[in-house]
């Protein structure tokens, strides 16, 4: 592990995680990722709770650690439940690019894949994963790497998930090509992106921010998204579902700092962002090579 990527506070949190006791606990899945502890005294429960608080903000989830409910900003099971009917992961090598704290990877464990590897350069979300996996004890491999590292990464994958990443990239076609290099022959990519619900082969390129987010480069129409995928030499573009992002799926909770969706929309017209652009809608697609 390259500790040069960690600041001093993050090193301290990592040390606290690694020094946690090896608890007797059971892992289960529902809409939340659940850990049930056996014989957990109040002092240990307080230690777990305080460590979870130190790892705010929690964007993906939720997680239930005994009776500690980490109510994340995103109700991530909504997205996972959209993808679930289309998943066939048994015996496959799976990657989640932009894996955040591992919520989706933990959910994938029930599909009996051969392996799961997560890629995300965020030390913060890596620490959240390390904290959770201290109790879950999965064999998930978390790499502090971004999508640009995939062409040189040693392993290849049968299925790759890349959810909520492409609009953060200044060259989306290059990103798709990088994802393609990491797939085995016959592999598939599940992609989720914000999109513009209009006809035409174009993408919105926000002047400064979109929904108060500074690093949004291109929000495509569905037709433009398909064109990107085909230019990257993917085939069998399949639109699985579209969905408007609403206040049930993304909202402020005590487990995040700052604002959430209600602050990002025009208070007089929730079909628009605060900047006047169309409000976020998401498209879920699958492509193959």
UniProtKB/Swiss-Prot annotation:
<dbReference type="InterPro" id="IPR029063">
    <property type="entry name" value="SAM-dependent_MTases_sf"/>
</dbReference>
<protein>
    <recommendedName>
        <fullName>tRNA U34 carboxymethyltransferase</fullName>
        <ecNumber>2.5.1.-</ecNumber>
    </recommendedName>
</protein>
<feature type="binding site">
    <location>
        <position position="60"/>
    </location>
    <ligand>
        <name>carboxy-S-adenosyl-L-methionine</name>
    </ligand>
</feature>
<dbReference type="Pfam" id="PF08003">
    <property type="entry name" value="Methyltransf_9"/>
</dbReference>
<comment type="function">
    <text>Catalyzes carboxymethyl transfer from carboxy-S-adenosyl-L-methionine (Cx-SAM) to 5-hydroxyuridine (ho5U) to form 5-carboxymethoxyuridine (cmo5U) at position 34 in tRNAs.</text>
</comment>
<comment type="similarity">
    <text>Belongs to the class I-like SAM-binding methyltransferase superfamily. CmoB family.</text>
</comment>
<keyword id="KW-0819">tRNA processing</keyword>
<feature type="binding site">
    <location>
        <position position="282"/>
    </location>
    <ligand>
        <name>carboxy-S-adenosyl-L-methionine</name>
    </ligand>
</feature>
<keyword id="KW-0808">Transferase</keyword>
<dbReference type="GO" id="GO:0002098">
    <property type="term" value="P:tRNA wobble uridine modification"/>
</dbReference>
<feature type="binding site">
    <location>
        <position position="74"/>
    </location>
    <ligand>
        <name>carboxy-S-adenosyl-L-methionine</name>
    </ligand>
</feature>
<dbReference type="GO" id="GO:0016765">
    <property type="term" value="F:transferase activity, transferring alkyl or aryl (other than methyl) groups"/>
</dbReference>
<feature type="binding site">
    <location>
        <begin position="147"/>
        <end position="148"/>
    </location>
    <ligand>
        <name>carboxy-S-adenosyl-L-methionine</name>
    </ligand>
</feature>
<feature type="binding site">
    <location>
        <position position="79"/>
    </location>
    <ligand>
        <name>carboxy-S-adenosyl-L-methionine</name>
    </ligand>
</feature>
<dbReference type="InterPro" id="IPR027555">
    <property type="entry name" value="Mo5U34_MeTrfas-like"/>
</dbReference>
<dbReference type="InterPro" id="IPR010017">
    <property type="entry name" value="CmoB"/>
</dbReference>
<feature type="binding site">
    <location>
        <position position="167"/>
    </location>
    <ligand>
        <name>carboxy-S-adenosyl-L-methionine</name>
    </ligand>
</feature>
<feature type="binding site">
    <location>
        <position position="98"/>
    </location>
    <ligand>
        <name>carboxy-S-adenosyl-L-methionine</name>
    </ligand>
</feature>
<comment type="subunit">
    <text>Homotetramer.</text>
</comment>
<feature type="binding site">
    <location>
        <begin position="120"/>
        <end position="122"/>
    </location>
    <ligand>
        <name>carboxy-S-adenosyl-L-methionine</name>
    </ligand>
</feature>
């Amino acid at each position: 592990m390259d500790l040069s990527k960690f600041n001093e506070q993050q090193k301290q949190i990592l040390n606290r995680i690694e020094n946690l006791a090896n608890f007797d606990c059971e892992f289960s899945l529902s809409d939340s990722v659940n850990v049930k502890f056996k014989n957990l005294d109040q002092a240990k429960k307080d230690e777990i709770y305080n460590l979870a608080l130190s790892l705010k903000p929690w964007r993906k989830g939720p997680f239930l650690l005994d009776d500690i409910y980490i109510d994340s900003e995103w109700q991530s099971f909504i997205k996972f439940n959209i993808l679930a009917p289309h998943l066939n992961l048994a015996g496959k090598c799976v990657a989640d690019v932009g894996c955040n704290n591992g919520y989706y990877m933990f959910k994938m464990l029930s599909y009996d894949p051969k392996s799961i590897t997560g890629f995300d350069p965020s030390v913060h979300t890596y620490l959240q994963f390390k904290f959770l996996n201290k109790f879950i004890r999965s064999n998930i491999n978390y790499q502090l790497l971004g999508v640009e590292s995939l062409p040189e990464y040693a392993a290849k994958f049968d299925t790759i998930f890349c959810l909520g990443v492409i609009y953060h990239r200044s060259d989306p076609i290059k990103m798709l090509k990088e994802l393609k290099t990491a797939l085995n022959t016959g592999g598939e990519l599940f992609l989720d992106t914000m999109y513009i619900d209009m006809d035409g082969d174009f993408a919105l390129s926000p002047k400064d921010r979109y929904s108060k987010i500074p690093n949004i480069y291109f929000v495509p129409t569905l037709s433009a998204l398909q064109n990107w995928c085909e230019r990257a030499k993917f085939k069998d573009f399949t639109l699985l579902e579209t969905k408007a992002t609403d206040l049930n799926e993304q909202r402020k909770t005590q487990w995040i700092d700052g604002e959430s969706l209600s602050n990002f929309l025009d208070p007089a017209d929730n079909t628009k962002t605060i900047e006047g652009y169309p409000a976020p809608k998401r498209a879920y697609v699958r492509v193959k090579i």
